[in-house]
């Protein structure tokens, strides 16, 4: 979670984890590096990437490219979530709920990075089970993908937005 930088198209990039891995062969061990990154525009678009290479910069670059290719749109509501959501991936489960203005991002580790680049400013979040960064990122993105805006719900049910919101 070291750096965040702006780039062309105003995408925010965050490095979540770099890990050294090894492959054991007859002549010894071959070391390589993995990098986990998230990319977002700060306005509801977010993606993650996982890259692997013999050198750290190459692994980060691969991860950033994959993150830019795998972006999703998230329907935010004034810098917070539409409603409480749950996400899961393998052993990781996350719970996120909207928070009032001024609360900030109350989330740990990898989940915080995803929410920051997605453009969420106020949220209460908790990770349960495995806290493996890759699985937490996937679970967070799963939860954000499953979130519906009132417009989406109204379209699915064939009702007006006012009926859905109870106004």
UniProtKB/Swiss-Prot annotation:
Any one GO cellular component localisation term in the record: small ribosomal subunit
Official protein name in the record: Small ribosomal subunit protein uS5
Subunit structure: Part of the 30S ribosomal subunit. Contacts proteins S4 and S8.
Highest taxon of the lineage: Bacteria
Domain (S5 DRBM) ranges: 11-74
Any single biological process term in GO: translation
Gene Ontology terms, MF aspect: rRNA binding; structural constituent of ribosome
Entry function: With S4 and S12 plays an important role in translational accuracy. Located at the back of the 30S subunit body where it stabilizes the conformation of the head with respect to the body.
Keyword RNA-binding attributed: yes
Keyword terms of this UniProt record: Ribonucleoprotein, Ribosomal protein, RNA-binding, rRNA-binding
InterPro entries: Ribosomal_Su5_D2-typ_SF, Ribosomal_uS5, Ribosomal_uS5_bac-type, Ribosomal_uS5_C, Ribosomal_uS5_N, Ribosomal_uS5_N_CS, Ribsml_uS5_D2-typ_fold_subgr
UniProt similarity note: Belongs to the universal ribosomal protein uS5 family.
Record remark: domains: The N-terminal domain interacts with the head of the 30S subunit; the C-terminal domain interacts with the body and contacts protein S4. The interaction surface between S4 and S5 is involved in control of translational fidelity.
Pfam families: Ribosomal_S5, Ribosomal_S5_C
């Amino acid at each position: 979670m070291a750096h965040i930088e702006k780039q062309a198209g105003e995408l925010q990039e965050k490095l979540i984890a770099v890990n050294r891995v090894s492959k054991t062969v007859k002549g010894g061990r071959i070391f390589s590096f993995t990098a986990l990154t998230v990319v977002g525009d700060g306005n509801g678009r977010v993606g993650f990437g996982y890259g692997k290479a013999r050198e750290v910069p190459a692994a980060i670059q691969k991860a950033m490219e994959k993150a830019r290719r795998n972006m999703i749109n998230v329907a935010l509501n004034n810098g917070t979530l539409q409603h409480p959501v749950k996400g899961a991936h393998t052993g990781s489960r996350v719970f996120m709920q909207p928070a009032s203005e001024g609360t900030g991002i109350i989330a740990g580790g990898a989940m915080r990075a995803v929410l920051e680049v997605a453009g969420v400013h106020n949220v209460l979040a908790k990770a349960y089970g495995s806290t493996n960064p890759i699985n937490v990122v996937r679970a967070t993105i799963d939860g954000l993908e499953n979130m519906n805006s009132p417009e989406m719900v109204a379209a699915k049910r064939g009702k007006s937005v006012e009926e859905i919101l109870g106004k």
